[in-house]
């Protein structure tokens, strides 16, 4: 049978999602926990291999990650939640579990993904935001030009070649992606970016955030974003911004799979950011 799980995690202790030899990853920890719960004998018959909706990078967090795996073990839905959580560290939690059809794939059945980037900006870092938000030093009297940033985002909506925002390590078969929404929310000294699309390239969100911040500080004009997009050249875009503030917030699937909504309100992010 196929089981889908919804999970949240603090990505700061991990070297990203994907299994790596001699590295602590979310996938490693999750598969060990599931294997411990189902038992050694069941794993010999059918080893636990998880498929995820989004392979987050080192330090990136998740509020609404979705995975699936196949197993011969049958349990009640809440038994999966309680049982697997008992083998997980406090930085990872399963919120829900449910059996799904063999047609469901956590990765390929998804048609929308939404990320949130949280930034703290000001003259001093906040220790309370350590690893939970990005940081940019700004003088006390300075703030971002939100209107210029939002205007620069207009050229990104729709289907485009996002090669200028793609890392050299990206394994995607195509740089063509579709962005449906970009919203920039200012709550000084906090700044939030909500970006929704069908899929994203490696480092794409962090590279976009880096460009937005250049525009917001007046170092580039709002027209610069369109120039970067059209160039299809990573070298002319802003440097990749830090991972700390990036959250995989939500994965959307066709209604036929009845995948539960993520528990966004359990996060520290304000309702204005997550409540839409």
From Swiss-Prot:
Keyword set, alphabetical order: Isomerase, tRNA processing
Reaction equations catalysed: uridine(38/39/40) in tRNA = pseudouridine(38/39/40) in tRNA
Top-level taxonomy: Bacteria, Pseudomonadati, Pseudomonadota, Betaproteobacteria, Burkholderiales
UniProt xrefs under InterPro entries: PsdUridine_synth_cat_dom_sf, PsdUridine_synth_TruA, PsdUridine_synth_TruA_a/b_dom, PsdUridine_synth_TruA_C, TruA/RsuA/RluB/E/F_N
Family: Belongs to the tRNA pseudouridine synthase TruA family.
Keyword hit for Isomerase: yes
Assembly, per entry: Homodimer.
Enzyme Commission number(s) from the entry: 5.4.99.12
Organism per entry: Polynucleobacter necessarius subsp. necessarius (strain STIR1)
SUPFAM superfamilies for this protein: Pseudouridine synthase
Record's function text: Formation of pseudouridine at positions 38, 39 and 40 in the anticodon stem and loop of transfer RNAs.
Pfam families from the UniProt entry: PseudoU_synth_1
Catalytic residue list: 57 (nucleophile)
The protein, known as: tRNA pseudouridine synthase A
Top-tier EC class: isomerase
């Amino acid at each position: 049978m196929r089981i889908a799980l919804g999970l949240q995690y603090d990505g700061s202790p991990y070297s990203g999602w994907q299994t790596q030899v001699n590295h602590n990853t979310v996938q490693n920890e999750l598969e060990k926990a599931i294997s411990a719960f189902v038992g050694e004998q069941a794993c010999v018959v059918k080893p636990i291999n998880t498929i995820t909706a989004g392979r987050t990078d080192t330090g990136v967090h998740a509020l609404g990650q979705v995975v699936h795996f196949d197993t011969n073990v049958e349990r009640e839905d809440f038994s999966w939640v309680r049982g697997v959580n008992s083998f997980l560290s406090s930085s990872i939690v399963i919120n829900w579990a449910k059996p799904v059809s063999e047609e469901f794939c956590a990765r390929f059945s998804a048609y929308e993904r939404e990320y949130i980037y949280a930034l703290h900006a000001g003259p001093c870092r906040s220790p309370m935001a350590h690893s939970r938000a990005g940081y940019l030093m700004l003088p006390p009297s300075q703030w971002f030009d939100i209107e210029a940033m939002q205007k620069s985002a207009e050229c990104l909506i729709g289907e485009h070649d996002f090669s200028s925002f793609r890392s050299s390590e990206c394994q995607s078969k195509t740089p063509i992606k579709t962005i449906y929404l970009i919203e920039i929310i200012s709550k000084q000294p906090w700044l939030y970016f909500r970006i929704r699309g069908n899929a994203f390239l490696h480092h794409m969100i962090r590279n976009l955030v880096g460009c937005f911040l250049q525009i917001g500080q007046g170092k580039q004009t709002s027209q610069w974003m369109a120039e970067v997009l059209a160039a299809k050249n990573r070298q002319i875009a802003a440097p990749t911004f830090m991972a700390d503030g990036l959250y995989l917030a939500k994965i959307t699937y066709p209604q036929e799979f009845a995948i539960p909504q993520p528990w966004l309100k359990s996060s520290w992010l304000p309702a204005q950011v997550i409540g839409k």
